Amino acid sequence: MDEIDNIILHSLRQIGCTLDDEVTSLDEFSPTLLVQVVSKCITLIDSSLDLPRTLPPGMAQRFTATASLAEACRTIGYRRDIGYQTFLYSNVAEVRRVLMFLIERLPKESADKAAGTGQPLDVTTELESRICASLQSQLQAPWMPEFCRTAAGPSSSQIAFRRFVPRKLNIPFVTQGDIAAEVKEFWSRQASLDTLDEDSFIPSVIAANDGALKASGGAIDEVDRIKVCSPVDRLQRFYTSSEQKSSVVPVGKVAVEEKLDALAIVEAARPGKTPLESLQEEIDQIRVEIERAVGEGTGLEGERMEVVELCEVQRAAVGKLKDEKKIKERTHILLEDPEVNVRKLQGIIGAGGERMKKLQDQWDVHRIPLEQELEGYRVKHSDKLSQSQQIVDQIEATRHKSEEVMMDLQTKSAMHARLQKELEKLNRTVSRTAYTSRILEIVGNIRKQKTDIDKILQDTRTLQKEINTITGQLDRQFTVTDDLIFRNAKKDEHAKKAYKLLVTLHSDCAELMALVQETGAVKREIRDLEDQIETERSRNTAANLAQICRDLAEMQSESQRLEESLRAHLR
C-alpha cells in the first residue's frame, strides 16, 4: 500500500496540488487537504462544476461543502458509497479508493503533465530548468563588445553597430561669440564633470582635451616632427657639462671618478661603436656603481644597528646611575646634620602615629555598627543560605543532566545528518517507468495468488468428492454389515453383542462427523468476525466518534450563539 500511496502522491504533485514534502502517505491527509485535492481533481475532470476550493471554518458550511463534493464525485461516475463522512471522518481505504478513481478519470494532458522528465514540478526543479535554458541561450549567442549590445540582450537580429561620436562639455553659452574669453575660461574651470550623466562624461572629457591641445597649438600631427636627440648628442652634452663642473669644483675623489666615467662613456660613444652599444656599456657601468652603493649602504646599515644597540645599553646604564645618584644625594643630605634630621624624622613618625590612631578611632566608629548590622543580616538570612545551597545543588544536578542531554543531542544530530545525507543520495523521484514496472509486478503477484487460490479450490473440490465417495461407501458397507449381523443376532449371542457395538460405533462416528462440521463452521465464523474487526479498526471508528462528538458540540455552541443573536435582534 505504501507504493500505491507514493504513486497517488506523485500524480497529485504532477497536476499541481500543493503537498508538503513531509506528506509521504495518505494517513497524513487532513480533511482540509483532502478537500483541496479532491476539488482540484474534479475541476480538471469537469471544469463546469462549481466546487469549494477549501474547507470552511463553520460546521454547517463544512457539511454543505463536503456534501457538494460527494455529489460531484457521483456525477462524474463514482459508484461506491460516498458522502460528507468520507471527507470529514474518512479512513485510509476510502480515501485511497476515491483518489485512485479521480486519478484514473483525469484528462490525458493533465495526467501526462511533466511526464518528459518523470519528476515532480516543484519550485526548485522549475528554477533549475530556467537557469539551464538561460545559460544554454547565452552560450549559443555570438559574442559582441559591450558598446554593440542593445538593451534587449545579445541577439543576432538586434545588433546595432554605433560609431563613437564625441560631445561638447555642457557649459552654458560657451559657443556664443559675444562672450568674453575670460568669462568662457571661468566657465570652463568651474564646470564640474561630476554633474554630467554617464553617456556624456567620457565624450566630454575627450572633447575638452582636444580643445586644450588645439589652444596650445600642439596638434597630434606635429609630434612626429619633433626632433629627438640621439644618445651620442646627450653623451656629448654630459661630457661638456662635466668639463665645466670640473673647472669650478675642486678635484676630489668623487669628481675624478665621475670624470673618468664620463671619459669612458665618450670613448665608448666615439665612431666605431653604435649608439646602442654605447648605451649598453653606460647601463652596465651604472649598474656596477649601483651594486657598489647598495653594498656600502648595507654595511652602513649594519653599523647603524650596532650603534643603536650600543646607545640603548648606554641609556639603560645612565638610568641606573641616575637612580643611584638620587639615593646617594638624599643620604648625603641626611648625614650633613644628623641630630636635626633625626628630630625631624621622629616628629614625622610621631605625627604619623597620632594620625593613624585618629583614623583607627574613626574606622572603629564606622566598623562596629556595620559589623553588628552584618551579623544581624547573617542570622536573618541563614535560612535563605540553606535554601540557596539547595537551589545550587539543583542547578548543578540540572547542569549535569543538561550536559548528558546535549551529548545525546549531538549524537542524534550526527546520526540525523548522516541519515539525511543517505536520504539525499537516494532517488526520491522515481520515474513513471519504475512505477509501471512495479504495477506490473503487483499485477503478476495478484495473478499468481489467483492461480494459487484456484488450485486450492480445485483441491478442495477434489477432496470433497473423495469425502463424499468414501462416506457413500461407508454407508453402504454399514448397511451390508448391519444386515448380515442382524440375521445372525437372532441365533447367536455373540452376534447380538457385535450388532449392538456396531450400532454404537455408527452413532459415535456420526456424532464425531457432526462435531467436526460444527467446528469448521465455528472457525469460519471466527475468521469472518476477525475480518470485520480489522475492517472496523481500519475505519478509525473511535477517532471518528470522538471527532463527531467534538463537531456536535461545536454545532450546538454555534446554534446556541445563533439563537442568542436572534433573540437579541428580536428584542
Curated annotation (Swiss-Prot):
Keywords: Coiled coil. It comes from the Eukaryota. It holds the Pfam family CCDC22_N. InterPro entries: CCDC22 (IPR008530), CCDC22_CC (IPR048348), CCDC22_N (IPR048349). One of its GO terms (molecular function) is cullin family protein binding. One of its GO terms (biological process) is positive regulation of ubiquitin-dependent protein catabolic process. Transmembrane segments: none annotated. Residues 406-434, 509-571 form a coiled coil. Belongs to the CCDC22 family. This is Coiled-coil domain-containing protein 22 homolog. It comes from Culex quinquefasciatus (Southern house mosquito). The lineage of its organism: Eukaryota, Metazoa, Ecdysozoa, Arthropoda, Hexapoda.
